[in-house]
Curated annotation (Swiss-Prot):
PANTHER family: MANGANESE EFFLUX PUMP MNTP-RELATED. This is Putative manganese efflux pump MntP. The lineage of its organism: Bacteria, Bacillati, Actinomycetota, Actinomycetes, Mycobacteriales. HAMAP family: MntP_pump. It is a multi-pass membrane protein. The chain crosses the membrane at residues 37-57, 64-84, 111-131, 135-155, 164-184.
Length: 190
């Protein structure tokens, strides 16, 4: 898998965590660096682990002979479906975001958000098993990219950038749809 695809995929799955970090960052009032690092770390770890789990599930199914004939369609549908859902969610979520008034990063809500934003990475990991992508490289890239973007997102949110979260999710969704289309297109040409 080309490096540019790895980076685009990583940015695509990190979009939800980035948007959540912006929202959470609006509530961080003290210990900004420490709390932003904790939040970004939680998101990064989840985004690194979930595609590995998804890849393991997908690998089992990818080895079944009847699925090999349609593996490119499965990867496309998973990526396009996740991307479309991200775009839908960006326009159909409540404006009332659950923020913490004290500015503290409470562990339980942060873990729940980490899990919720990484479900997409689980599905992407499943899709990547069908195209035999290098999951360790992808998982590390997804985790690191999510960590960095979440750190930036928390900082942006703290400094009044809450209005960018929804658009980040839309762009991430479009990237995933584009990558799914690229997998399908490459398979049909090759």
């Amino acid at each position: 898998m080309p490096l540019v695809h790895v980076m685009l995929l990583s940015c695509g799955v990190a979009a939800d965590a980035f948007a959540c970090s912006i929202a959470r960052g609006t509530a961080i009032r003290v210990n900004i660096i420490k709390r932003s690092l904790i939040l970004a770390g939680i998101f990064g770890v989840f985004q690194a682990l979930m595609p590995v789990i998804g890849w393991g599930i997908g690998y089992f199914f990818a080895e079944l002979s009847f699925i090999r004939a349609i593996d490119h369609w499965v990867a496309f549908l998973l990526l396009a479906g996740v991307g479309a859902k991200m775009i839908w969610d960006a326009f159909h979520q409540d404006a009332d975001v659950d923020v913490i008034d004290t500015g503290a990063v409470q562990l339980r809500p942060a873990l729940i958000l980490g899990l919720a934003t990484s479900i997409d990475a689980l599905a992407v990991g499943m899709g990547m098993a069908f195209v035999h992508a290098p999951i360790i490289t992808l998982a590390l890239a997804m985790g690191l990219t999510t960590f960095v973007l979440s750190l930036v997102g928390a900082w942006m949110g703290h400094h009044g950038g809450g209005r960018f979260g929804g658009w980040a999710t839309v762009i991430g969704g479009l990237v995933l749809i584009g990558l799914g289309g690229n997998i399908l297109f490459d398979h049909m040409l090759g």
